[in-house]
Regions:
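Metal- or metallocofactor-binding catalytic centers and their adjacent structured scaffolds
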Residues: 5, 39-116
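Shared catalytic-loop signature of beta/alpha-barrel
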Residues: 215-218, 226-241, 248-346
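C-terminal extensions of enzymes
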Residues: 330-375
Length: 375
């Protein structure tokens, strides 16, 4: 089998409602992605997805398309797509960085190999550890009253974990949000606080002091991704689990955080981490040192969500809480059928070959802003 061509589709789809994040990311009204098709001479087509989010990463939809055209495609066309490790090793030498573009390719290769052997991708990653995973429900920045309304709706829908976005408001306001949510819903739902790099070390410590015993189950990436020493200071004072997200894109960053003993968990995002192969290495390294994994998401569509699920279901070190397999639910539409796997705040691992997701060609055409084919 050989790779014969690549197709790239830059898509944009609005959110169902505006998504308020931290002061770093602002309010988001739509999500963009680059959808990848990798064609083979046997007629098997592998699907991948890159999910750029500025300033989360330096990559944009335009850079993903250019890097794929100019640097990745020349290393892929004519190659045997089943030799995933060899391709990964070659691209590590030939293409530095660009993990989002690399991730789309890696997803597509696993999709091809799974389809060629009539196996779901999780069978290529170690086999099922769990066949169902609970979802977390995300809540954007808002008031305590808005939080209470959204959390109540999530509980009615079966959610047991909520991720509250913070980092946009003054720290005293964020403290009040945490206290209000804990006092109203304690015992009914686990609370994750995600500050998305929106705080300083001092603000984070003030948050800990202010909430007292009304602590979340987990705090994610409160400060700048590069400040490992600051994160360690927070870790030493944290009354809850602490996870890194923006600060753990590569295996080298994961190793640095482990050496520093700065976190309890890593937030895995298959697109951010450069695909299934690299994300699997990060998760395995975390497990070896006793760290847990939160399967999180960028502003993703169904292909990345499907790839993430294929990985998450094989990991023995997932956190005992909800995980971010609800990304397509916050969109006004999706270009796949991934949502059919979701019921009552739980996602069931599909048994179909490859990534286990189907592309809706009409919707792909509808939402495409730019297109590129490389032979």
């Amino acid at each position: 089998m050989k790779i014969t061509a690549l197709e790239l589709f830059h898509i944009s789809i609005p959110f169902a409602k505006p998504y308020k994040l931290s002061r770093v990311y602002g309010t988001r009204y739509d999500a963009e992605a680059v959808i990848l098709k990798v064609h083979t001479d046997e007629g098997i087509v592998g699907l991948g997805e890159a999910d750029p989010l500025n300033p989360f990463s330096e990559e944009t939809p335009a850079t993903v398309m250019v890097v794929t055209r100019d640097h990745l495609a020349p290393q892929l066309i004519g190659q045997n797509p089943t030799r995933i490790s060899a391709i990964e090793s070659n691209l590590d030498v030939m293409v530095h960085g660009n993990l989002l573009a690399r991730g789309a390719v890696n997803m597509a290769l696993f999709d091809i190999v799974g389809k060629a052997n009539n196996l779901p991708a999780h069978m290529l990653l170690g086999g099922l550890y769990q066949d169902k995973v609970p979802l977390l429900g995300p809540i954007g920045s808002g008031t305590p009253e808005e939080d209470a309304e959204f959390i109540g709706e999530l509980i009615e829908s079966g959610y047991k974990t909520v991720m509250i976005k913070m980092g946009a408001l003054p720290i005293r306001a964020e403290i009040q949000r945490m206290i209000a949510a804990h006092e109203k819903f304690d015992g009914q739902i686990k609370i994750i606080v995600d500050a998305n790099q929106g705080w300083t070390v001092a603000e984070t410590l003030e948050f800990f002091d202010g909430i007292g015993s009304r602590r979340p189950a987990l705090l994610e990436q409160p400060i700048d991704r590069h400040d490992i020493s600051g994160l360690k200071r927070i870790y030493q004072r944290a009354p809850c689990l602490l996870s890194a997200d923006e600060g753990v894109a590569s295996i080298q960053e994961a190793a640095a955080l482990i050496r520093a003993q700065a976190v309890d968990a890593f937030s895995i995002k298959v697109s951010k981490n450069g695909g299934l192969s690299k994300a699997r290495k990060i998760a395995a390294t975390a497990d070896a040192f006793g760290l847990k994994i939160l399967m999180n998401s960028m502003l993703e569509f169904g292909i990345t969500q499907a790839a993430s699920l294929q990985l998450g279901c094989v990991l023995p070190n997932l956190l005992n809480m909800g995980h971010a397999y609800m990304s397509v639910l916050r969109m006004s539409d999706d270009i796949t059928d991934f949502d059919q796997n979701i019921s009552r705040a739980t996602v069931t691992v599909p048994s179909q070959a490859g990534l286990g997701v189907r592309l809706n060609e009409e919707k792909l055409k509808k939402y495409t802003k730019d297109y590129l084919k490389i032979k």
